[in-house]
């Protein structure tokens, strides 16, 4: 297991309020690491990278299509994108090199998912990643 994968598992999935997580390399538009069982397709990667490449207001208006579901965007700015679909959601945080992706499902607290993902994003930005 790579250092980055164990970081995802320990800091995000370890909260019990993140269902799955992944790191996407922004420049290469490719998946770097993901939690076991989290299959992020090239189409999903493009969707997330484009969500930040476009004007954040556009992502907010149009929402996000991720992993076969339409999500309503509840926050979109330079560094963060939060979207939800009923009782599930996706949190995406941008660092210098990566998009950090975390999902939550019914019964999990979105606020804990957001806090853990944003904290890991801050850590990676401070490390220059």
Curated annotation (Swiss-Prot):
InterPro entries listed in its UniProt record: PFN, PFN_euk, PFN_sf
Tissue: Expressed in testis, in germ cells in seminiferous tubules (at protein level). Prominently expressed in pachytene/diplotene stage spematocytes.
Protein's GO biological process: acrosome assembly; flagellated sperm motility; manchette assembly; sperm flagellum assembly; spermatogenesis
Compartments in which it is found: Cytoplasm
One of the record's GO cellular component terms: cell cortex
Residue stretches spanning the membrane: none
One annotated GO molecular function: lipid binding
Alphabetical UniProt keywords: Cytoplasm, Developmental protein, Differentiation, Lipid-binding, Spermatogenesis
Protein purpose: Involved in male fertility. Required for manchette development and acrosome biogenesis during spermiogenesis. Binds in vitro to phospholipids, including phosphatidylinositol 3-phosphate (PtdIns(3)P), phosphatidylinositol 4,5-bisphosphate (PtdIns(4,5)P2), phosphatidylinositol 4-phosphate (PtdIns(4)P) and phosphatidic acid (PA). Contrary to other profilin family members, does not bind to actin in vitro.
Family note: Belongs to the profilin family.
Protein name: Profilin-4
Gene: PFN4
């Amino acid at each position: 297991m790579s250092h980055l994968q164990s970081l995802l598992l320990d800091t995000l999935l370890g909260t019990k309020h993140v269902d799955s997580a992944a790191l996407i390399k922004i420049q290469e538009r490719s998946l770097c690491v993901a939690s076991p069982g989290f299959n992020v397709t090239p189409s999903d990667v493009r969707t997330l990278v484009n969500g930040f490449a476009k004007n954040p207001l556009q992502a907010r208006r149009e929402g996000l299509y991720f992993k076969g579901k339409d999500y309503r965007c509840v926050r979109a700015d330079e560094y963060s994108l939060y979207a939800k679909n009923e009782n599930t959601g996706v949190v995406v945080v941008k660092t210098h090199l990566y998009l950090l992706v975390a999902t939550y499902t019914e019964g999990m607290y979105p606020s804990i998912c957001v806090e853990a993902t944003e904290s890991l994003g801050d850590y990676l930005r401070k490390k220059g990643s």
